[in-house]
Amino acid sequence: MHTPGTPAPGHPDPPPLLLLTLLLLLAASGRAVPCVFCGLPKPTNITFLSINMKNVLHWNPPESLHGVEVTYTVQYFIYGQKKWLNASKCGSINRTYCDLSVETSDYEHQFYAKVKAIWEARCSEWAETERFYPFLETQVSPPEVALTTGEKSISIALTAPEKWKRNPQDHTVSMQQIYPNLKYNVSVYNTKSRRTWSQCVTNSTLVLSWLEPNTLYCVHVESLVPGPPRLPMPSQKQCISTLEVQTSAWKAKVIFWYVFLTSVIVFLFSAIGYLVYRYIHVGKEKHPANLVLIYRNEIGTRVFEPTETITLNFITFSMLDDTKISPKDMNLLDKSSDDISVNDPEHNEAWEPHWEEVEGQHLGCSSHLMDAVCGAEQRDGDTSLTQHGWLNSTIPTGETDTEPQYKVLSDFYGEGEIQLSCEPEEAARTEKISEPLVTSANLDPQLEDLHHLGQEHTVSEDGPEEETSITVVDWDPQTGRLCIPSLPIFGRDPENYGHYERDQLLEGGLLSRLYENQAPDKPEKENENCLTRFMEEWGLHVQMES
C-alpha cells in the first residue's frame, strides 16, 4: 500500500533530463505540450462516498486556486492489478467529483483512486485515496416507511432499500439480499409528552399498540448493518395522528350480545335457584278436601275439623199413649233401631236423601201442629223451627236457608226440618219418637213397623194391657235415626223412667251432651204447651219463626 503523493506501483517518476528531452521532441513535431509539474497545489480531501453501492469520488479544489477555472483528471486502480486505469467519464473535468460506480461495481473487490489538477500548462501532483472496500464501507439508506393509524395504534411497514443499478431496466437487487442481517432502528416521538423511544426490528412490519388516541406521533427509521461502524442515514421524519375513540358498529354489537347473554345466564340461574329454594323450603302438601281450619273463639285455638255440609234431619213428634204400647211392641221398636247395620250398603243407599219423596211422608201433620199443641195461636201454613247449638252454626228450616260460616260438604249431615204432630185422640201419656226423613220412595221396613205400630194403637178398640211403661231413646249416627221417648206432660211418670235407655246411651257417649235428666217431680202446668216442656226437659233451644 502506498501513501498519497507517491508514485503508484509500476509507475516510477521519469528523470528530469529525460522529461526535458521529451518535451523538446514534442515541440519540434508541433503537437500539444502536456502540462509540466511546476509546483501547482494538488486537490485535497479526496474520498469515496458510497450509498447502496453507488460509489462516487469527491475532492476539494487546490487551496490557492479558488475562483480559478481548474480541470481535473481521475484514475482508479484495482487492488491486485499492476497499472492505473483512466476513468472513462472523468478526464479533464471541471467538477470536483467523479462517479466510479461502474468501475467499482464489484463490491467484493478493493479499489484506489487519484486526482490531478491542471491549470493552463501547469499541473499538480496526484492526490490518491485510501483503499476503498465497498462491502464494508458503503452506507445503507433507510427503508421506505409507510404508516397506518388506528384509534390507539400505528402500523409501520418497512421496505428495504435497493442496490444501485446501472440502468433502470436492470434487475433490482435489495440490500436485504446483500446484507441478510440488516436491521432497522425505529424511533417514535410523542408530540404531547415530548418523549422519544426506539425499537430495533428485523422484520418489515411493526405495530405500535396502546398509544394515546388523537395524538400526533413522528417516526423516523435508519438501517443498521452489522460490522464496522458506518455513518447512520436516518429517514425523513414522518408524522401521523392517532384516531379519536369512536364506538363502531361491531363494538356496539359485541356489547349488546355480551349484555344479552349475561342477562339470559343470570335469569336462568335465578330461576333455577328459585325453583330449588321452593322445592326445599316451600311445601307442596295440600290438606285433604274434607278438612278446613276452623277458628273456635271460645277455646282460642284453631283445629282441623271436617268440612262437610250440615244435613238437617226432620224430626216428627208423634204423641202416643204408653198404655197402648205393649212390651212386645216396645221390643219391636228397640229391635227396629238396633238391627240397622252401618255396614250394609243397601241400607245406606235406601237412606239417601230425596226431599221430594219425603215431604209427603211425615208421620204427623206439621201444618196443624200448633193448632193441637199450642192452642191455635199460630195457624200459618208452614211453621219453621230453628234449632241453635248444633256445631255452633245456624240451621235453616223450611224454605229459609242460611249459609254456614265455612264451606261444608252435603254428605256429612242431612238437611231437615223439625216437625211436630199431635194426634188429638191419643192419651195424655205419650211417647215421642223422632225420626229422620225417609230418603227413598219406599220406606224402610223397620220404619213401616213403627208406622203400623202407631196405627195399631190408634184403631184398637180393646183397652191396652196394664204393663210397665218403657222409655226408649235411640239414635244411630250412621243412618241418622233419632228415637226420643214421650214427654211426661200429663203428670204420670212410670217408675224408673228413662234410666235404662240413659245407661245404654251413655255407654256409647253419643248423646252424652244432649241427654239431661228429666224432672218428674216438677209440678205440672196444664196451660204450658208441649213444645215448651220439650225444650225444658231436653235442654233444647228452639226458635219459632212467625
From Swiss-Prot:
Pfam families xref list: Interfer-bind, Tissue_fac
Domain (Fibronectin type-III): residue spans on this chain: 42-138, 139-245
Known glycosylation sites: 45, 86, 94, 185, 203
Signal sequence segment: 1-32
Entry annotated with the keyword Repeat: yes
Topology in membrane: Single-pass type I membrane protein
Assigned GO CC terms: membrane
Record's subcellular location: Membrane
Ranges of the Cytoplasmic topological domain: 275-546
Main location as per UniProt: membrane
Gene3D superfamilies for the chain: Immunoglobulins
Any one biological process term the GO annotation gives: positive regulation of intrinsic apoptotic signaling pathway
Gene Ontology MF: a single term: interleukin-20 binding
InterPro entries: FN3_dom (IPR003961), FN3_sf (IPR036116), Ig-like_fold (IPR013783), Interferon/interleukin_rcp_dom (IPR015373), Type-II_Cytokine-TF_Rcpt (IPR050650)
PROSITE patterns: FN3
Topological domain ranges for the Extracellular compartment: 33-253
Residues that span the membrane, as ranges: 254-274
Source superkingdom: Eukaryota
Disulphide bond pairs: 90-98, 218-239
UniProtKB keywords: Disulfide bond, Glycoprotein, Membrane, Receptor, Repeat, Signal, Transmembrane, Transmembrane helix
Function: The IL20RA/IL20RB dimer is a receptor for IL19, IL20 and IL24. The IL20RA/IL10RB dimer is a receptor for IL26.
Subunit structure: Heterodimer with IL20RB and heterodimer with IL10RB.
Family the entry assigns: Belongs to the type II cytokine receptor family.
Name by which UniProt lists this protein: Interleukin-20 receptor subunit alpha
Gene symbol of the encoding locus: Il20ra
